């Protein structure tokens, strides 16, 4: 396939924190929340929207609690500022609307649930609010927030070995469900996920897999079974992520909406000229995201 597609980028918004009594292990900044900008004609336009939303968000958070610390552009929300993460999502939705991008930008969340999962009783503690949750309660909670807020991507919504509940959510949520801890860029785990219908997207961390040829084998396998592949820059690949994301025709990419990585994507878009295609909402998995794409096309 010719490399000509530019993926949907995101921009960092909020880093997790021990807001509600914390997880079972140290959350390490999870869940993280980003905004994905998909309703645009070019990567450059999407990147501008990422910058615009992030700037407004930083100002809003500054007004809310002054001098917010941040981890790699993710703003760390201190304890006691919000009663639950639903208040954060309301503020994020407000920011998107104020910037004029309603229906063209949505949420990506890396839940990294393993941090909050107690293997003894199977419950999740300190995730989103201070209520412990069984996997079924967490599943219902996700369906509720997907109805209430513009979520387009959830990553690792359940613990890394819960393929069955992940599969149910993949089917019922209608959005992009990404496996990171679920798959660890490992072809055997991806193959097992495929048999279960768990997730519809594999997070790609090149450093996790050993060799580039192993990574390519995993990518081809995922594509063969209709899964998407979402490159992640979480391990400091730098600007090279843009070259290989376009090289594999990825539909979406973790963050990369602002800064040097975004600049490299825009250079590639300019080099490709008229052949460059920004995938937009079509680059996102899930029937709800395809409905978003339909709605945007009707508006054109």
Predicted segment positions?
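Mobile "lid/hinge" segments at catalytic clefts and subdomain interfaces of large enzymes
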Residues: 1-77
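Catalytic core of soluble alpha/beta enzymes
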Residues: 67-69, 82-299
């Amino acid at each position: 396939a010719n490399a000509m597609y530019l993926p949907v980028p995101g921009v960092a918004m909020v880093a997790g924190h021990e807001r509600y009594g914390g997880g079972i292990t140290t959350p390490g900044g999870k869940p993280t929340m980003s905004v994905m900008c998909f309703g645009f004609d070019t990567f450059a336009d999407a990147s501008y929207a990422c910058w615009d939303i992030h700037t407004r968000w930083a100002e809003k958070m500054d007004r809310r609690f002054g001098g917010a610390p941040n981890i790699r552009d993710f703003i760390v929300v201190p304890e006691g500022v919000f009663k639950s993460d639903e208040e954060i999502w309301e503020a994020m939705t407000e920011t998107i609307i104020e910037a004029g991008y309603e229906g063209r930008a949505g949420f990506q969340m890396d839940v990294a649930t393993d941090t909050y999962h107690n293997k003894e009783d199977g419950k999740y503690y300190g995730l989103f609010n201070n209520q412990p949750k069984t996997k079924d309660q967490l599943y219902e909670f996700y369906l509720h927030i997907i109805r209430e807020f513009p979520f387009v991507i959830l990553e690792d919504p359940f613990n890394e070995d819960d393929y069955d509940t992940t599969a149910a959510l993949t089917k019922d949520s209608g959005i992009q469900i990404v496996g990171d801890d679920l798959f660890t860029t490992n072809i055997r785990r991806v193959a097992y996920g495929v048999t279960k219908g768990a997730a519809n997207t594999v997070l790609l961390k090149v450093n996790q897999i050993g060799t580039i040829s192993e990574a390519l084998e995993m990518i081809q396998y995922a594509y063969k079974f209709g899964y998407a592949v979402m490159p992640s820059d979480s391990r400091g690949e730098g600007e090279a992520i843009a070259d290989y994301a376009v090289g594999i025709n990825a539909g979406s990419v973790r963050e990369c909406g602002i800064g040097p990585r975004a600049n490299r994507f825009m250079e590639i878009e300019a080099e490709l000229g008229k052949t460059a295609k920004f995938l937009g909402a079509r680059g996102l998995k899930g029937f709800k995201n395809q409905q978003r794409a339909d709605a945007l096309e009707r508006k054109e």
